[in-house]
Structure formats: C-alpha cells, structure tokens
Amino acid sequence: SKLPGGFDNVNVTGGEPTLRKDLLEICDVLYPKSKTLEISTNGLKPDLLIPIVKKYPNIKIRFSLEGKEDTNNLIRGENDGFNKKVEGMKKLIDAGGKDLGFAFVVQDENVHELSFVYDLTKKMGIELSTSTLHNAWQFHKNDNYHYDRLRSAKAMESLITNMLDTFGEWRATVNPI
C-alpha cells in the first residue's frame, strides 16, 4: 500500500466500522503502519471483531457504553445494548484481546452512572475511556451545551478518587511498604 508508516495512533471509527466487510483488510494495512491501531465501535457486532483480535491481540478496541441498561438504551437508541456489549466484550477477552475497553461520553443523562461503568471495567479487567462534557445530535441534542456542570464535576471527582484508590491498592501489592 502507498500509505506511509510511522503513525502514533490510528482510530478506525464511524459511522460504524463493523458495517464494513473489509474491516480485517483495513486492519491488515493499518496495523503495521501505526504504534496503536484502535477500532471505536458501538459494540453490537463483536463476532465480526473476533478474527481481528485473534490476528492482532494488541489492537485497541473500545465499545461505546453510556451507563446501565436503561440509560445506555435511551442515549444510544439501542435495545438490550448494555448486555450485548458486556457479553461481546467477554468474547473479545476470551479471543485474546489485550487492549479492550468501554468508551463513556459524559453528559447530563448519564453522569450519575460513571462510577458504575468504571467498577464494571475494573471487574472485567478492561479499560475505561471518557469524553467529558459533551453532547451532540447523535445524543438527541444540537446545542452542545452541558447543563449540570457541577454534578459532572462531582462525578469526575468521585471517579478520580476511585481510580487513585485502585492505584493505591495495586501499588501496595507491587511495592509493599
């Protein structure tokens, strides 16, 4: 391919990447040309990602997850999306994926479930990525205005505290004082 190499990060994103029949071939071209290749997906078709994860276990895959079942379904317009994504992520873990996680877009409608999703990722042994204070047309808003910033700040503070506690627990096992 004529595409140059040396990219730090390449993210294959949407629309929805798993709608492409040639997603594995796209990964075949991009994987050797970047330090990190990521697929950002809604996570509803994990079986299409299994061959990619088996071929490239270090590929970074993030499923969009906006909270518990009802919240995720409301924001994403999905039916049973939460369970499908959790079960799908387990399939990718079983397939040998090493850089897996959920992506959470913080907004007024779901900020109260941020710690829940973080705890879920800890239990599953996967990552959590967040995009904060964001809304847009795909979240049924056009003003891109976050209304309850104080509530979001408190939720982020709680998440950071939880993460620091987790780090402290981990460090105590690695380097006991």
Regions found by a protein language model. Give the residues of each.
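Radical SAM enzyme [4Fe-4S]-AdoMet core and its adjacent flexible, acidic
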Residues: 1, 28-29, 33, 55, ...
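Conserved Radical SAM active-site core
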Residues: 1-58
